[in-house]
């Protein structure tokens, strides 16, 4: 009687070993008894990630919803974060973000000797004057 030969991929073996060896390593006394950093204890810095990983509560829910929260930092960073997390055309949103800020583009300086206001308006995109 011949048994069917089964080939086990290296990825499956590696995953199985990680699942068997990783939890005991994480639960060891050295990993579980990490001291709280001074800045977190004194509240002099932001320790949201440290609190999610080591604090009390549902860590999985906190980590899984960390990227979906809308309370981003104000200003340009917050708008960029909202653009990256929103659905739609991200490239178009990022490329037009500066134009939507409400500021008019700065006028280009005139580099020629015979530069006047009407001539500056007739400058071609390549930088050559149309006059």
From Swiss-Prot:
Coiled coil: none
Leucine amide modified-residue sites: 66
Record-level GO BP terms: chemical synaptic transmission; eating behavior; excitatory postsynaptic potential; negative regulation of DNA replication; negative regulation of potassium ion transport; negative regulation of transmission of nerve impulse; neuropeptide signaling pathway; phospholipase C-activating G protein-coupled receptor signaling pathway
Signal peptide start-end: 1-33
Pfam family, one: Orexin
Post-translational modifications reported in the UniProt record: Specific enzymatic cleavages at paired basic residues yield the different active peptides.
UniProt subcellular location: Rough endoplasmic reticulum; Cytoplasmic vesicle; Synapse
Propeptide segment residues: 98-131
Disulfide bond entries: 39-45, 40-47
Sites bearing Pyrrolidone carboxylic acid, chain numbering: 34
Methionine amide PTM positions: 97
Tissues and organs where the protein is expressed, per its UniProt entry: Abundantly expressed in subthalamic nucleus but undetectable in other brain regions tested (hypothalamus was not tested) and in heart, placenta, lung, liver, skeletal muscle, kidney and pancreas.
UniProt cross-references to InterPro entries, sorted A to Z: Orexin
Alphabetical keyword list: Amidation, Cleavage on pair of basic residues, Cytoplasmic vesicle, Disease variant, Disulfide bond, Endoplasmic reticulum, Neuropeptide, Pyrrolidone carboxylic acid, Signal, Synapse
Any single Gene Ontology cellular-component annotation: extracellular region
GO molecular function: neuropeptide hormone activity; type 1 orexin receptor binding; type 2 orexin receptor binding
Record's function text: Neuropeptides that play a significant role in the regulation of food intake and sleep-wakefulness, possibly by coordinating the complex behavioral and physiologic responses of these complementary homeostatic functions. A broader role in the homeostatic regulation of energy metabolism, autonomic function, hormonal balance and the regulation of body fluids, is also suggested.
Disease with which this protein is associated in UniProt: Narcolepsy 1: Neurological disabling sleep disorder, characterized by excessive daytime sleepiness, sleep fragmentation, symptoms of abnormal rapid-eye-movement (REM) sleep, cataplexy, hypnagogic hallucinations, and sleep paralysis. Cataplexy is a sudden loss of muscle tone triggered by emotions, which is the most valuable clinical feature used to diagnose narcolepsy. Human narcolepsy is primarily a sporadically occurring disorder but familial clustering has been observed.
Family to which this protein belongs: Belongs to the orexin family.
Protein name: Hypocretin neuropeptide precursor
Organism: Homo sapiens (Human)
Lineage, broadest ranks: Eukaryota, Metazoa, Chordata, Craniata, Vertebrata
Name of the encoding gene: HCRT
